Amino acid sequence: MAELTAQQVKEAGLAAGLDAVGIANIERLEGAPEQMQVANIFPECKSVIMTLRRIPRGVYRGIEEGTHWSNYTFYGYNRLNSFFRPLGTYRLACFIEDHGWEAVPVYPGVAEAEPSRAPVRDGQVGANVFPAIRIAAVAAGLGECGWSKVFLTRRFGPRQRLGMILTDAELEPDPLVEPNSICTLCMACAQVCGGHAIPHIRENKFVEIQIEDKTYRWGDVDMGKCTATHHGLNKEVSPFLARDCPGLRLNIAEQEISEEEAYKLAYTVAGGTWRKTDEFPTGNVVDYYKTMLQSTGYYAVCGANGCIRECMIRMEKAGNVENEFHEEFRKKPKWQLNYKGEVVSE
């Protein structure tokens, strides 16, 4: 059987179109909850291989200008996660299996509930097990979670999506990134987030994990507000909701909505129809959301206003990103709406 080394795996990943590959040994992830344990997917797993593809900076250009939204959903979020990145992950998994080792590609999804189903065998957890993909990437030495819990790397800052392969091949793990060597805790993400979902460090709300001798910490993000904003229930980031529901006054900052409630409301609105009238001739509750759902099966609206765009801008200005550009990203004052959907100055 042909030898397989960590270096061979990384070279094969790059040849398959991935931008980076990191490797963790299984021991680094043993402290995860049972419903997130990779060993519950593949008990013989010895190495966790993390795959990464960049989000092109230009994906955010249309939203930054306030003129074009669909690129973020297609090239920066859903289709990058469900099509472009998995191609490289699939090819790398095949390469590993050509060397005689089993390779389990894991899609970075989430369970519908935890557990989703009762155990199908005595003594094991129920379906569905989904590892924490960003924490696994930290364990594989690719980067760290920023204060917003968005994954950061030295090369791309906050601009990447992640995948995973579990294998029974024992591969040399990568060194861990030092905590806060990429995220400087500048709080730009918290200050700019349109959903008011990221706590400021002064609020002392955080999540903390230990991997070997290193402690990683990030803000305890309000996922209800985050989800409601991401999926367009917030007029501060959505001119579409402002246009199609002009009388709605929903201040997300004042809501105590759960993540599940936000999903339930958002997708009901996005896929919803009503009778056609002169005021709303299409019959869609919100036209853009329905269009994007039909085009891609997903829709994203906020464009990662604070957690990615503002973080990216600050990191680039500070010279903390290896992927450099000739021009600054933000070339004019940032557009902004209030919770009523009215245009306000920055």
Description of each model-found segment:
Residues C307-E346:
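C-terminal non-catalytic accessory extensions
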Residues Y60-R61, V104, N320:
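Short, solvent-exposed secondary-structure capping/transition elements
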Residues I49-T51, I165, C311:
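Short beta-strand element of the conserved SAM-dependent methyltransferase core
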Residues M1-Y90:
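Non-catalytic, usually N-terminal nucleic-acid engagement modules in DNA/RNA processing proteins
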Residues A32, F74, N78-A304, I313, ...:
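Catalytic cores of enzyme domains
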Residues E27, I55, L171, P199, ...:
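Flexible, active-site-proximal loop/turn residues at the rims of small-molecule/cofactor binding pockets
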